[in-house]
Swiss-Prot record:
SUPFAM superfamilies: HCP-like, TPR-like. Belongs to the PPR family. P subfamily. InterPro entries: Mito_RNA_Proc_CCM1, Pentatricopeptide_rpt, TPR-like_helical_dom_sf. One of its GO terms (cellular component) is chloroplast. PPR repeats lie at residues 186-220, 221-255, 256-290, 297-331, 332-362, 366-400, 401-435, 436-470, 474-500, 504-538, 539-573, 574-608, 609-643, 644-674, 682-712, 716-750, 751-785, 786-820. Residues 40-61 are annotated as: Disordered. This is Pentatricopeptide repeat-containing protein At3g23020. Pfam families: PPR_2 (PF13041), PPR_3 (PF13812). It comes from Arabidopsis thaliana. One of its GO terms (biological process) is chloroplast disassembly. The keyword tRNA-binding does not apply. Residues 45-59 have a biased composition (Basic and acidic residues). Keywords: Repeat.
Length: 842
């Protein structure tokens, strides 16, 4: 069997049977078309509760009679008595009897559409054009078809059904064919009806029509199943579509290439790329076994190439393209466009250039080809190449579409290429290409960021005065000014919204955000309070924005008030606004208030997340309050929230402050376990562990962390300083000296404590020359020596034979006259150590 779908038999029966359906045939209880026109509103049929949509058959793109009634709209109607086309007055889905002979004005629209349809009908030849005209102009099917009764061929009946735009009319004609008794309705006719009803999402009728086929012994063919799979998958019922595929497999029928293409499209649309690939491979193998000369069409290859591309399988896409060429299938423009898009999206621009050369040998690039190329090169920051392709497109006689202009214009705008952008705008204006709101706001942002405020305002006014801007357009322009701190301009745009009565919650939210960026918290609050007076109700985003603004401005008390209002309106669905207020209280050192907000949050059944716990644990870690910090750790565990690196770092910081080595080690191990090859504990945390180990002279453990940090290039000044102190404390002067030398060579000595550690080591180990040189480096780098520095230097002088009294006298001079005292220290040290005096250079 081709496809072994493991479907439960009972579910298959439910999806593909009519036992639960109230009707046995789509026609058994179907009202006449005349009745439908009077009473029926499409999409509201009482027996169809599934998704509704109005569709047109793709083979017939227009019509002169509107059989659908849409509430509140005027539709085209034909007066059966005189064939005149006019408007219908529609009230609440029903035809207004007062507008019987209403007609269109002379704008040429109706005649143009009718001409296109007439041309299509005439192409059929024979009696078909007259039949279709009759069906459009005469309401009763019997009257419309009576001149041709009992002499319509199978082909003519097929065309008549296929040409129907509305499913109701198609059903009525289909029923008329059956009622005549002289017409044999074959599987092709049923296939057409299944497609028409499926496109209209009339699933109960589809199922009933299927049952009717089986009952009458009309055997489904490959295209029948393909049609069913197609309409169900496009109607959003993928499980039902798979059910029909399963039924097909169950009777041993192998999908043909068309049906296979439908299945592949279904999987691709659902982004189930692996299933699409598996199905294609199984089908291809079976096809090749059955007929070794089977050659797939370009459509099937294009579908698979696109499927591989969307799933990121470049190699497979390339191999499929290669196989297509080997089998002699001429690639289409769609094929090349797809391959260019795949290679370009994966950064293989060399392959893109090669494909373009090959493409020009087989088929002409279209506008979409150039749009893809322009987009790819703008994304890769090759704006010059993108512009060249835009020019090439026009040189080839292709007219850029709105996508072409929009892509290039956006690329110019984000790069502040004002002159190029303005040139493109002029071209768009000359060609009457509409500039969409997304592009308009991008250009406003370009002018703002280029500090061309006058131009930005005139650009905005152009679209504002035209009166076509939506709320989203106004809000985007407010945001363009607000993000750059141009508050007065943002306010002017906001006022313009009021002029055209387009103020919605979106504009208020963006304006409040702009006030927040400019630190105008009072204005943000005033605007919030004024919303209701303009009939605009704040939404969740409004409250969230205002609370975040106040919290970040160190105004947690006010933020808490709005948080309470937010909770009362039912907009608090998570802990994010509470976390903002808690963090603000913590920042101000008001931990009692932070805990109060936390308790309030828990009381209202709003669950804290790891960020909330992290803020509180870190706050109490900073104060060294182990008990409070651990209480939140326990609360987090009880809530089933796993710790993360932020929590672990805070705990290690806490344990370091209070000297809890075992607890710190346990947490550090967890931190290491949660890390990977590219992520390690942060520098501060590792330094904390080295500090704990060095205080306890646990040299090997400290060295292990130190070596690991050096390998990653993360060891900083304090890492080296702690290792130096540990070695010095344990009398390991050789290792300590090596550390000191490394610190000097790496030029990472920037802190008085680090310098003092190095000076203390050199003084203790008798390395007086290095000590003096280090002291000179310290002074020349502008780092102020302190009492600890001179204590080490005094030790050196006394070891070199100077009396304690003389050393004390030098120090007294330094305290009275800093500059003279430093010069005296340096000259004395240099003289006794035997190195050149560099006082003049200092």
């Amino acid at each position: 069997m081709l496809l072994n779908l493991r479907l439960d038999g009972s579910s298959l029966h439910v999806l593909c049977s009519t036992k639960t359906l109230p009707i046995s045939s789509p026609l058994d209880k179907f009202p006449s078309f005349k009745k439908l026109k009077q009473n029926y509103v499409p999409g509201t049929h009482e027996s169809d509760k599934g998704p509704q949509r109005s569709t047109r058959n793709g083979d017939r793109g227009c019509g002169t009679v509107a059989h659908e009634v849409v509430a509140g709209k005027n539709l085209l109607l034909v007066n059966p008595s005189n064939g005149c086309v006019g408007k219908s007055g529609i009230i609440d889905g029903f035809v207004d009897k007062r507008s019987k002979d209403a007609r269109f004005g002379g704008n040429g629209l109706v005649s143009e559409v009718h001409t296109k349809c007439s041309t299509k009908r005439l192409s059929y030849g024979g009696c078909i054009p007259a039949i279709l005209e009759a069906l459009d102009s005469i309401e009763d099917v019997e009257d419309a078809l009576s001149p041709w009764a009992e002499r319509l061929s199978n082909k003519e009946r097929t065309i008549i059904l296929k040409e129907q735009i509305h499913w109701e009319r198609a059903v009525e004609i289909f029923e008329w064919f059956k009622s005549k008794g002289c017409y044999e309705l074959n599987v092709i006719h049923y296939n057409i009806m299944l497609r028409i009803l499926g496109k209209a999402c009339k699933w109960r009728y589809v199922q009933s029509l299927w049952d009717e086929m089986i009952r009458k012994g009309i055997k489904p063919i490959n295209s029948t199943y393909g049609t069913l799979i197609d309409v169900y998958s496009k109607g959003g019922l993928k499980v039902h579509a798979l059910c029909w595929l399963g039924k097909m497999s169950k009777i041993g029928m192998q999908p043909d290439e068309v049906t296979t293409g439908i299945v592949l499209q279904m999987y691709k649309k659902a982004r189930e790329f692996q299933k699409a690939e598996e199905f294609f491979k199984k089908w291809s193998c079976d096809e090749n076994k059955a007929d070794s000369h089977v050659c797939l069409s370009s459509y099937t290859y294009n579908t698979m190439i696109d499927t591989y591309g969307k799933s990121g399988q470049i190699k497979e896409a390339s191999e499929t393209f290669k196989r297509m060429l080997e089998e002699g299938i001429v690639p289409t423009t769609v094929t090349f466009n797809t391959m260019i898009h795949i290679y370009g999206n994966n950064g293989q621009l060399g392959e893109v250039t090669s494909l373009m050369k090959t493409m020009k040998l087989h088929c002409a690039p279209d506008t979409r080809t150039y749009n893809i190329l322009i987009s790819l090169h703008t994304k890769n920051n090759d704006i010059e190449r993108a512009g060249a392709y835009f020019k090439e497109m026009k040189d080839d006689g292709l007219k850029p579409d709105p996508v072409s202009y929009r892509t290039l214009l956006y690329a110019f705008s984000i790069r502040h290429m004002v002159e190029e952008a303005e040139g493109l705008i002029a071209e768009m204006d000359d060609d009457n290409v509409e500039i969409d709101e997304y592009t308009q706001s991008a250009l406003t942002r370009m002018y703002v960021e280029a500090e061309m405020l006058e131009k930005s305002w005139s650009w905005f006014k152009r679209f504002h005065v035209a009166g076509n801007m939506s709320s989203e357009g106004y809000s985007a322009n407010i945001d363009a000014y607000g993000e750059r701190g141009y508050l007065s301009e943002a306010e002017r745009v906001f006022i313009c919204c009021q002029e055209v009565n387009k103020r919605t919650v979106i504009e208020y939210n963006v304006m409040i955000k702009a006030y927040g960026i400019s630190k105008s918290c009072e204005k943000a609050c005033e605007l919030f309070e004024s919303m209701m007076s303009y009939g605009v109700t704040p939404d969740k985003c409004t409250y969230n924005t205002l609370v975040q603004i106040l919290a970040s401005a160190d105004m947690p008390h006010k933020g808490r008030c709005y948080l309470e209002k937010m909770r009362e309106t039912g907009y608090v669905s998570d802990c994010i606004p509470y976390c903002a207020v808690i963090s603000s209280f913590v920042k101000l050192g008001q931990l009692n208030m932070a805990e109060e907000v936390y308790k309030e949050m828990v009381e209202y059944n709003i669950e804290p997340d790891v960020v909330v716990y992290g803020v509180l644990i870190n706050a109490f870690a900073d104060t060294g309050n182990v008990q409070q910090a651990m209480s939140y750790v326990e609360a987090m565990k009880e809530a089933g929230i796993p710790g993360n690196s932020v929590i672990y770092n805070s705990l290690i910081k806490l344990y370091t402050k209070v000297g809890y080595l075992d607890e710190a080690e346990a947490i550090y191990r967890k931190l290491l376990q949660s890390c990977n090859k590219t992520q390690y504990p942060d520098v501060y945390t590792s330094n904390c562990m080295i500090n704990l180990y060095s205080e306890r002279s646990m040299v090997r453990k400290a060295e292990a962390i130190f070596d690991s940090m050096k390998q990653r290039g993360e060891a900083n000044e304090f890492t080296f300083a702690m290792m130096l102190c540990m070695y010095k404390k344990n009398g390991r002067f050789e290792e300590a000296t090596q550390i000191a030398k490394q610190m000097r060579e790496m030029k990472i000595l920037t802190d008085p404590l680090s310098y003092n550690s190095v000076l203390g080591l050199f003084a203790l180990d008798g390395r007086f020359k290095e000590a003096v040189e280090t002291f000179k480096e310290m002074v020349s780098s502008g780092i102020q020596p302190d009492d600890s520095t001179f204590k080490s230097l005094g030790t050196i002088l006394m070891k070199l034979g100077m009396s304690k009294k003389a050393v004390r006298k030098i120090e007294e001079i330094r305290k009275k006259e800093i500059k003279r005292g430093l010069e005296l220290w340096i000259s004395t040290l240099s003289s006794l150590v035997g190195i050149g005096d560099c006082v003049d250079e200092l």
